[in-house]
């Protein structure tokens, strides 16, 4: 069965898993999802993730969620650019999330990265999601 918004599905699984105080959540694997998870791991929003093969050609990602003193580290995670409404931004037009406490994840010509990395590399792109 095809999925209209795979990244939106990943973000919803993370959001629902943290609301239910799950330690791990599982999602179908794709390179975009893995790249977004790598940014979340690097920025300290998740403990980590692992890719496992269910059968040849079908893989899944197991995501270890992170909590601090019993509270989810991710307070809010939301999709900005959707399949029906793509949102692109120059680096100068990119706004800070939660007064700099959160991050924006971008898909740029140099790969998927956080807004701080995009600012240092001076590159804009598609605004995938915001996390804080």
Swiss-Prot record:
Keyword Thylakoid: no
Biological-process GO terms, alphabetical: translation
Cross-referenced SUPFAM superfamilies: Ribosomal protein S8
Leader sequence residues: none
PROSITE patterns the record matches: RIBOSOMAL_S8 (PS00053)
Top-level taxon in the UniProt lineage: Bacteria
GO MF assignments: rRNA binding; structural constituent of ribosome
Cellular component terms per the entry's GO annotation: ribonucleoprotein complex; ribosome
Swiss-Prot/TrEMBL keywords: Ribonucleoprotein, Ribosomal protein, RNA-binding, rRNA-binding
HAMAP family per UniProt: Ribosomal_uS8_B
Function: One of the primary rRNA binding proteins, it binds directly to 16S rRNA central domain where it helps coordinate assembly of the platform of the 30S subunit.
PANTHER family to which the protein is assigned, alphabetical: 40S RIBOSOMAL PROTEIN S15A
Subunit and partners: Part of the 30S ribosomal subunit. Contacts proteins S5 and S12.
Protein name: Small ribosomal subunit protein uS8
Gene that produces this protein: rpsH
């Amino acid at each position: 069965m095809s999925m209209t918004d795979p990244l939106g599905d990943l973000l919803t699984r993370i959001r629902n898993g943290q609301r239910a105080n799950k330690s791990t959540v599982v999602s179908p694997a794709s390179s975009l999802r893995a790249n977004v998870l790598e940014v979340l791991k690097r920025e300290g929003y998740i403990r980590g993730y692992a890719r496992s093969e269910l059968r040849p050609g079908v893989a899944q990602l197991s995501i270890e969620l992170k909590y601090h003193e019993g509270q989810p580290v991710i307070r809010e995670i939301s999709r900005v650019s959707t399949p029906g409404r793509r949102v692109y931004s120059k680096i100068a037009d990119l706004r800070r999330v939660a007064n700099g406490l959160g991050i924006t994840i971008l898909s740029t010509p140099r790969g998927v990265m956080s807004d701080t990395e995009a600012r240092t590399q001076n590159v804009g792109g598609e605004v995938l999601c915001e996390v804080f």
